[in-house]
Amino acid sequence: MRFLVDANVSPRVAALLAAADHDAVAVRDVGLAAAPDDDILDWALTGDRVIVSHDTDFGTLLAARRQVKPSFILVRSSDPLTADDVAGLLLANLDSVAEDLGAGAIVTFARGRLRVRRLPLG
């Protein structure tokens, strides 16, 4: 799977996903560290990448645009998560949501729960 890891998620998550044989890059590594969310969304769409973020704004943008892609993984936690925690959470659950992400979805990951909403929203 192809991932774009947002600036508010440790770039180490991209490295850990890449080490697990996924094509993963961090926004800072592709010149998007200070880019607005719209630009990040467009870049992910062009590259058929799943955005990984703690930022709920991507869901709002996808709903406003009524887009089917790119898929978006929202990582939520009331406790701070390390890069290893985030990557572990994703890798442990990717098989169960791969079809949804491939079709276009917002997937919310949190410890102990998972929510999938197919795109477009609305």
Regions of interest found by a model, annotated:
Residues R2-P11:
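N-terminal beta1-alpha1 ligand-phosphate binding loop
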Residues G59-N93:
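Mid-chain, well-packed structural core segment of small domains
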Residues L45-L62:
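Acidic, metal-binding active-site segment of PIN/NYN-like and related structure-specific nucleases
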